[in-house]
Amino acid sequence: MARYTGPAWKLSRRLGISLSGTGKELEKRPYAPGPHGPNQRKKLSEYGLQLQEKQKLRHMYGMTERQFRRTFDQAGKMPGKHGENFMILLEARLDNLVYRMGLARTRRAARQLVNHGHIMVDGARVDIPSYRVKPGQTISVREKSNSLVVVKEAIEVNNFVPEYLTFDADKLEATYTRHAERSELPAEINEALIVEFYSR
């Protein structure tokens, strides 16, 4: 299944969750798009709830189904809870951590920064958004890219960097000190439903 490239606001309203992280998509119309408006949402079956939860998380991180399922399978080989491990692996993606650093306003914008070669890991350019960052590694913006307007604007409005990142705003650099804990990850996601979906 290909990555969704349509309007983020429309998908956010359909899934009932802010994919941009700003919440603006749901401020005025917190219901699915379409002619039926707020009356369109219907009670979902157990399978429907599981599928919806999977789609919410997959689109939140901007992944294809193949990438998403591969990461899920990798999480299943780790000790501990499958669902929590899955969330932790998703959070360790390079494009996501660029977003968490506040270098981009959305994960989609962060993915573009990585794709276009503006981001380095431990001093080496990495242009693979799905690159999994390991604790202790340092993420930074290339010196030639420090003056990017999109980065400056994102930094100005960002007022929160998670505790598993130590961020230096002057250097535009952060160290991924440890894996995130479940309490630091999206509370609106029920990963148990996703585990149930793939276990069918």
Swiss-Prot record:
Residues 92-152 form the S4 RNA-binding domain. GO terms for biological process: ribosomal small subunit biogenesis; translation. It comes from the Bacteria. Residues 22-42 are annotated as: Disordered. One of its GO terms (cellular component) is small ribosomal subunit. InterPro entries: Ribosomal_uS4, Ribosomal_uS4_bac-type, Ribosomal_uS4_CS, Ribosomal_uS4_N, S4_RNA-bd, S4_RNA-bd_sf. SUPFAM superfamilies: Alpha-L RNA-binding motif. Keywords: Ribonucleoprotein, Ribosomal protein, RNA-binding, rRNA-binding. Gene3D superfamilies: Ribosomal Protein S4 Delta 41, Chain A, domain 1 (1.10.1050.10), RNA-binding S4 domain (3.10.290.10). GO terms for molecular function: rRNA binding; structural constituent of ribosome. Belongs to the universal ribosomal protein uS4 family. Part of the 30S ribosomal subunit. Contacts protein S5. The interaction surface between S4 and S5 is involved in control of translational fidelity. PANTHER family: 30S 40S RIBOSOMAL PROTEIN, SMALL RIBOSOMAL SUBUNIT PROTEIN US4M. One of the primary rRNA binding proteins, it binds directly to 16S rRNA where it nucleates assembly of the body of the 30S subunit. HAMAP family: Ribosomal_uS4_B. This is Small ribosomal subunit protein uS4. It comes from Bacillus cereus (strain ATCC 14579 / DSM 31 / CCUG 7414 / JCM 2152 / NBRC 15305 / NCIMB 9373 / NCTC 2599 / NRRL B-3711). The lineage of its organism: Bacteria, Bacillati, Bacillota, Bacilli, Bacillales. The gene is rpsD.
